[in-house]
Amino acid sequence: MKNSIKSILIICVLFAGFNVTAQKLGHVNSQAIMQEMPDYDAARKELESYKNDLTKELEMYQKLIVEFAQDYEQNKGGMSAETRQRKETDLMERQQNYEKKAYEAENSLQQKEQQLLQQIMLKVNNAVKDLAEKEGYSYIYEVTTLLYAGGEDISDKVRKKLGIAVTAN
């Protein structure tokens, strides 16, 4: 019994020496902040222009394929079997090239979007990190991934740090 009491007292003394501090938690909606940045509008416009250029290029290529197919259909009656076979093969190759170009255009568009938005997201992340270090936050969570957002919403502080006007809620 005496050993149990001594053990409990020793444990109490040990834990009394620890300085228990509350962790400062915050959350931020970086997507909303990002969309409010002037850089975001410029990136969206650049991306839209890039998409339009790719679309025009694909439409022109598709138009050439349609014209080739129509020409083939109109003139296939007067063609030899060998010429018809060559034209059909050519048409299939053109269609496959079009599909390949469309796939490459989609990938290129996604890469461009990622490249443009990554630079903006980096600015937001750096502002969040700066704020966390200066104001002593232990953790800052992205609000879009949480079911419950406890702690302080630092989104307006990040907006101010990035020079974005903050409206009163």
Predicted regions and their residues:
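Bacterial N-terminal signal peptides that target proteins for export
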Residues: 1-8
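Bacterial N-terminal signal peptides
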Residues: 8-17
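Sec/Tat signal peptide C-region and signal peptidase I cleavage site
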Residues: 18-22
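Amphipathic, charged alpha-helical segments and their helix-to-coil junctions
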Residues: 23-169
